[in-house]
């Protein structure tokens, strides 16, 4: 079952764009970024060329915002939802971005 879509039209105010509260009700986007609430999700993504979707409610398990395309050999295994083991967060995040959010963390450690 996929998560319900975020209805951003409810946050649009004519002529003034989107104004959000500071309520902490985090959601995780398919970009694996944690947004403080649905309104902030809509505000920060209104100018993106592709529609961003909600992955799930609550914080993302692993933040992939500052990943590098070039990874170290550090060994801190992560098990992905695909059953694959990734040697470290960098390698995991590269795969998350490549798959556009269809991969998520199953557990820390080996699969």
Swiss-Prot record:
Q: Which GO terms describe its cellular component?
A: extracellular region
S-S pairs: 8-42, 20-39, 28-60, 64-93, 71-90, 79-111
Is Cell membrane among the key words of this record? no
The protein's site described by Reactive bond 1 for trypsin is found at 22-23
Family annotation (Pfam families): Kazal_1
Q: Gene3D superfamilies given for it?
A: 3.30.60.30
Kindly list the places in or outside the cell where this protein is found, as annotated in its UniProt entry: Secreted
Q: Which SUPFAM superfamilies match?
A: Kazal-type serine protease inhibitors
Look up keyword Ribosomal protein and say if it applies. Answer: no
Residue ranges of the Kazal-like domain?
A: 2-62, 63-111
PANTHER family given in the database record: OVOMUCOID-LIKE-RELATED (PTHR47729:SF1), SERINE PEPTIDASE INHIBITOR, KAZAL TYPE 2, TANDEM DUPLICATE 1-RELATED (PTHR47729)
Q: What does this protein do?
A: This inhibitor is composed of two homologous actively inhibiting halves: one which inhibits trypsin, the other which inhibits elastase.
Name of the protein this chain belongs to: Double-headed protease inhibitor, submandibular gland
Q: Which organism is it from?
A: Felis catus
